[in-house]
Structure formats: C-alpha cells, structure tokens
Amino acid sequence: MASSLVFVALVGALCFTLANAQHHYDEHKTTRMVWCTKSQAEQYKCQNLTVAIERDRALFDEVFLNLTCFMAYSADECIHHIDREKAHITTLDAGDVFTAGRYNSLIPIMQEKLEGGFADYQSVAVIKKGSLPDLNNLRDMRNKRVCFPWVGSLAGWIVPIHTLQREGGMEVVDCNNQVKTAASYFNNSCAVYSLSDKHNPIGDNSDKLCTLCTGKIPGGRCSSADPYFGYEGAFKCLLEKGDVAFLRHSTVNEMLQTTEFKNIAPDTFELLCRDGRRASINDYRQCNWGQVPADAIVTSSARSFSDRKQYQQFLKRIAELYSDGTRDDQSRQGGQSFNSRNNINDQNAYGQFDNNDPYRTQNQYDQYRSERLDSSFAEERNQQDGTNTSILYEKFRIFESKRYGKPNLLFQDSSRALTVIPEDDQSFTKYLGPAINFIYGIRECPVPAMTLCVTSENELDKCIKMRTALKAHLLKPELICKKMHSHINCMQFIEAGKADISVFDAGDVYTGGLNYDLVPFMSEVYNLGEPEYYVVAVAKEDDPDTELTYLKGKNTCHTGINTAAGWTYPMALFISNGWIRPYGCDSVRAAAEYFTKSCVPGAISNEYNTGVPYDSMCDLCHGTSYRYCRRDASEEYYGHTGAFRCLVEGGGHVAFMKHTTVMESTGGKRKEWWARNALNDDFELLCTDGTRAEIQDYKRCNLGKVKANAVVTRGGVNYNETQMNAYINLLTYAQQLYGRKEVDAFSFSMFSSPIGHYDLIFQDATRQLQVIPPNKRRYDAYLGSDFMRARRITDCYAGASQLALSVGLLLVGSLVAML
C-alpha cells in the first residue's frame, strides 16, 4: 500500500513538472510580430491584413501572432529598424538582402514563389519595339538614356552594370562608387538613390542619373517617393523618357494588366539580348542578362530559432489563407468592390472613407475602425448552411495590391506562395547562391591591391586593423600590410614594385623623391587648414637658462635624423646664423660638437648617417635592445610626441617638434604616466630672437613653416596614374568612414593611436588627408624652396645633387647658345 502511494505521488509530481514546464515554455513564446512597411500605401495594406487576421483568428490555431505595422519610408530604414529591434520583419529585393545581411546581420527566413513554383526572376533589358536601330551589341549601350528601378536592386542595377563592365566596355571610374562608373557611361538617366548618402558617401556624385527622374514634391525627386522608383517606376520611365529599362521578366506583363496601361499591347515592347538581338517579351528564358532570387522576408539574426519558427508558421498560414495561386487578376470575383485606382495621389486613392490618408493621424492609432475596411468586403451567399443569408466575407489578397493604389505592396503581385527557408540556409550567401557573384563582381577594381609599407610592429598592428576595417565595407583596392626595417627600405620596395605606398615626413619625401623617384600624392592636414605646420622649439617654463640662440652644452631632443621639424629646420637655423660651427655641411658633426647629449633617432644608423657615428647623439634615447635610437616607432623618443616625452622625462633642455604636439599631450589628453601631470603652462616656446612665448603663440614664435607628412608612391618610369587614382580613392573613402577621433575598443580610427603609442602611420594631429594637386606631385615642388634651402645647408649630399643639377643646366644652356 505504501509503495502504491509513493508511485502515485511520483506520477503526480511528474505530471505537475511537465505541466509547469509547458507553462514556462508558453510563457517564453513570442506573441507579436511587427512588420516594417516601406510606404504609406504598404502601411495601409498591412493594416488591412491585421484586421483580416483578427477576424480569422480562429483559423490560425496556435500559430497566431498579434501583427502590428511599423511604417518607414525605404528598405534601408526598415533594415535599420529591424537591426535595432523596433520591427521584426520586412520583405526585401535580393540586392537589399545582401546589404541587410552583410552590414546589419539580417537573415532571410522565407522566400516568395512565382507562378509554376519558380523562385527566381530573370533580369531583362526592355526597349520599345523598333527603337534604337544603332544598338547592335552591348558596347552600343554607351550614351543611352536608361531607366533603373533603384541603385542596388539586383535585377535592375547590379546585374546590368556587372554585365556592361564585362561585355559592354564600361570602365570602372571609381572602385568604390558604382554610380560614378554608370554616370560616365550612360546619358541622362533615372537611377533612384544615386544621390543618397549611401551611394554618394563623399558627396561628389553627378546628378546625371537623376536627370530623367520626375519627382516634384520636396525630397521626392530621385528618392523612393519618385514616380519612377521601383520596377513599375522604371517601366513608366521607359514609356515616357528612356531608351532602355532594366526590369524583372514579369514587370511588363504586370504593368499591362493595370488600368493605367491596359490599352498598351505587349508587342509594343521587346527584349534586348546580350548578343544585341531582339526577342519578344515572353522569350525571357532565352533572352535575359542573368537570374536572380525572388524577394525574401528577413528578420534579425538576433531573433531566436523559436521566434523565427513562429514567424515562419504564422506567415505560411497567412499565405495559405489569403492567396489564390490560380487567380485571374482581370476577373477576380468581388474585385470590383475594391478601390482599384492606380495612382495613390488620385482623388480616391485613400479609399472610400479617406482612412489611409497620411494626413489623418487618427488612423495611425485606431487600427481596427470598422469603416476603414468597408470597401474590402463583398456580399456573398452563405455556402455553409445553404440559406440566402447575406454575410460579409473579406476578400483580402496578400499577393494583390492594385486596390491600394500601387503595385507590389508587402509582396510582389507576381508571387503565388511563400516557401520556408531551412535554418541551415538562413544566410544571405546561401539565399543568393550564384547571384552573389554579380554583387561581388560589380565591386572588382582594376587595381586589385594596395600595399602599405610600415616600419614597426605597432604600425603593422594598426595597418592590419585598418585592413579589417576597410574590408568590412568592401572597399577596394584591398589593403596589404608590409613591415620593413626602415623608411629607406620602404622607399626601395616601393620603387621596385614590392610595395605601393608609405607615409613619410617631409625629410623622407625629399629622400624618396631624390633617390628613388617617389612622388607625394596626398598630404595630412592639421589645425591650420593647409597641409603644413610650424616648427617650434620647446623648453620647460622652470628652466629660464635655456635660450635658442645659445644651446651649447645643452641636452636636446629631436624627432629623428633628417626629419624636417626635428633636424633640418633647427640645424639650418643654427648653422646659417653662425650659432654653431658648420663643419662644411656635416650637420651631425656640428650637433655632436655643440650639444652635450641628444636623442636623434637614426643618428648612428649607416642608412641615414654615412659619416662618423657620434654616440652622444643617442645618449638620451630610451629604446631598449635593438630598438635603441631606431628611427621608427619602436624607439619611445621617436617622432614629435617622442621628442616631447624626451623633454618631459628624458633629461632634455629643449625639444624640436611641430606646433600641435604640446597641446595634444598636456592637460590630461594623454593617459600615459609620463604625461599625466604635464600642463600647457609648464612649457614655453623659444623664439629666434632669444625671447620666449606661450605655447599657443606658435604663429609668431617659430622656426619656420614646413609641409605636412605625405603619402608617396612610385613616380618616374614606373608612374601609373590608374594606380595612383585608385589609391587616392581608397584613402578618401577610408577617411570618410574612419577619420573620426572618438574611438573605443570596438572601433577603428585612422588618425588615432592606442594608449601608449602615438603617430602610428598617420600623425595623431591629422584632421584629414588632402589630395596634392598634380602640378605639386614632385618632391621639390611639394616641399617648397625654404625646405630645399634648409636641406642644402644641413646635408652634404643634397648640396652636391643640387650643384650637379645646376652645372648640368649651365652646360645645356651653353650648348644651346653655341648652336
């Protein structure tokens, strides 16, 4: 008896546990779904769907979800809202599915199916029959007026542009901007979004691809509000203004079934094949430009598998209840009970009771007002009990839109069903399949890669992060990072074609141009608004004995041997004014004989000092092991900030640097321990007249103005303008995306360095990169006469080179005179 009671108790406990578990499972089931709509008309159709679902709630059984509609104004807005979980699902063109998946982690969970069970469209080029007799092959597409659905649509933009790049002679003008490439190829056209921020990131697109667009309302031209937006809009554009329209194979027949175009015969149009021949509209299987997947329903990948499963079951039931795969759009029973206007701006476009009027705000809050759907019901006989009782049955159709004033709302009108995408296939790559080759192919660049040469491990780390950041946005050419032993090595590798670019100080721009035919093509810009900076001498405020006109016996801190601010300008000043003995043009010996101790990174390297090495030139340097006195970021006292650090903690009396360095490193702007207690007022500028000035007074108290650091590449016989333009293009887009200063652990900034490091690749003071005009892309033209004169004073080889050039010119002049 006791054992029986125990058994009963165990069974009861088990049942309670199972029931409780089921209760908790039900508790965690999602109960609602928010649908993001992309227009006012689509919002109205969605609201009609919510009422239909509420009426037929019993037919959904356990798969029912409370559906609400969230209105946006474009696919991009919906992608943004779903990514931030303000909405749950929307339908997207295959081109937008790529964008949503690649950049916002959205995934496709269901796909539309067309008549016959097909899940693909053919991309076709449509022309008016008998037009364009001069168009015999794809190369003849140049200078034609073209109608595109929108920039980024797979069938209407990506496939045609990709095809013309490979077969139609369309040259890539901008590796990272398809709109510029298309604008240089076609005549005036209409491609909606060609001036949007997304497709015009640096704001220099031509409006050529918006010229045919016809939007009138403010903000309506060349946007989703333009009458020529979408596949149906591109069809209208072809009828009224264009030579060619890129459409889906179903678009023409869909449009000819509408009231607006029902009097136009299908044979008014024909397809343009890739081989130049023409074909009938229905011959799209043999005459198309490529195959693309049908539209998909997407949601956030952050949604659980359980949520996605519920969405699929709910949407599948909607498609079953509210679709008619065999319907005839022209003779649908009860169809006349709907408002079938085609233009949403027509008099009755807002329905019998104006209840989808965007200016009637109450409709946004009262989604279930009965009068709103009065026009969506028809009177039918009750077929269940055989009586003549009249009952209103809703005639809602999920794959029909013309009653709402516009076609293809929520779903394409050519769709007949929805198919579930299995969990393992819920990614944009698997959904797109082979069509993804069109998307990546359109982004190919005639210059495949750009190799950046750096000189330290820290710079290499930053370069790799930069490569990852650029790759995330699919920017081309691909960035490759290469670390070399020194800047001289980088010059040699660039000249030999083993590297492509590097960022050099003005002194290295000189060396690279003189000895290796390198040319500067982009320069950094600091706080002056021009690619230049002031060279300043800085001393401590509590060290009044240090004076610029007499530094004998002092300890000095320099940015590096042969650098402009840290060596060439100050040494030229001292030598030219007779403050130190010149020893001919041997500035290293002059400094070693005059200063007691210094840190001049690179001073004992035979790459930079071909004369006698003086150990005192590195006595203040801080690098350990092989890093000691190296002319790169591995030496802690290298560069402008390194020279300032040498002054702060390394025993220096004076440091030579650019005018922004002190302000960048004091007042808590740097977190490193050596800079924590440093304030602007602790330091002063040394002026050439022996006086001092405040740090901010650099315009009056300086050693001269020098050109900013520059990005260099090959010149001379190896000069390649296509490559240079591709490098300029990549760096321009890179700074647009990553030029900000405010960074965190999860973001990248081109013009910032990690805590503990400074001026990696680019100067931390950089605000932007500026393209150097073509007439300044020689080292001497860029650097200017002041720098060239200073270099001749401090560098024996510079003087010899200049002398040889002058003698050569003199001989040529004499020969000409004799002739």
UniProtKB/Swiss-Prot annotation:
Any GO BP annotation: septate junction assembly
Amino acids binding hydrogencarbonate 1: A155, G156
Taxonomic lineage: Eukaryota, Metazoa, Ecdysozoa, Arthropoda, Hexapoda
Glycosylation-annotated residues: N48, N66, N187, N388, N720
Region Disordered: start-end pairs: 325-361
Source organism, top-level taxon: Eukaryota
Propiece residue ranges: 797-819
Name of the gene encoding the protein in the UniProt record: Tsf2
Descriptive protein name: Transferrin 2
